[in-house]
Amino acid sequence: MVKKSEFERGDIVLVGFDPASGHEQQGAGRPALVLSVQAFNQLGMTLVAPITQGGNFARYAGFSVPLHCEEGDVHGVVLVNQVRMMDLHARLAKRIGLAADEVVEEALLRLQAVVE
């Protein structure tokens, strides 16, 4: 039985990105923006984009979105070119904030440009 997800689109979570290889974002505990809707998240996997204070390549290439929070004190940019499907429960993620609606909308538009 799949555990109900408490994570919703727009949530900022603290989650481990290890293991990672190559150019993938890594880190034992880093913030990420939830992009998938709660109905999908209830299936056990969640689409997230890492948040960084670096990300120069992504900034110049148009793959990042400046982060503005409605809740929480997280700063940086959302790296849309580094999205990843994750089991947030298995990775013991916790909610640490909420992104502004315009941040989520812009991230989804940039993600759409990546996959089209």
Curated annotation (Swiss-Prot):
Disulfide bonds: none annotated. Induction: Part of the chpS-chpB operon. Keywords: DNA-binding, Endonuclease, Hydrolase, Nuclease, RNA-binding, Toxin-antitoxin system. Transmembrane segments: none annotated. The keyword Ribonucleoprotein does not apply. Toxic component of a type II toxin-antitoxin (TA) system. ChpB is a sequence-specific mRNA and (weak) tmRNA endoribonuclease that inhibits protein synthesis and induces bacterial stasis. Cleavage is independent of the ribosome. Cleavage occurs at ACY sequences where Y is not C. The endoribonuclease activity is not as strong as that of MazF. The endoribonuclease activity (a toxin) is inhibited by its labile cognate antitoxin ChpS. Toxicity results when the levels of ChpS decrease in the cell, leading to mRNA degradation. This is Endoribonuclease toxin ChpB. It comes from Escherichia coli (strain K12).
